Amino acid sequence: MTLRSILHYPDNRLRQLCPNQTEYNDDLRKLISDMFETMYHEKGIGLSAIQINVITRVITIDVSKDKNEKIVLINPLILEKREPIVFDEGCLSVPGFYEKVDRYNYIKYQANDIEGKVFEAESTDLLAVCIQHEIDLSLIHI
């Protein structure tokens, strides 16, 4: 595992549209391992690959208090969203800044797992908000 540097706003590299991840191999596993190490080191709950200057749609998340519930979403896509809320969000790429953002408390989404298999899942509350935030980063919504 390698600790990676996080890009900070207004770095223009954060404004790149990320293409879908197409290769599922040891390089991807290493990237994901590095992303978790970096995210935990920075005390974050989510990280998009673009934040460490890797231009692909890979997201790592762990909203658990004990940091033992790792979630990896590759090429995530929101299929359904309900229950609008306003959430006070922070971002590792904009340290110390928080802003109220319109989100949804419930989402149904599709993603690939680390082997490339497509799956669907539902999330609510903080996890749903975190997924929406990280997807936005990979789609140039910073």
Which residues does each PLM region occupy?
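Positively charged
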Residues: 1-140
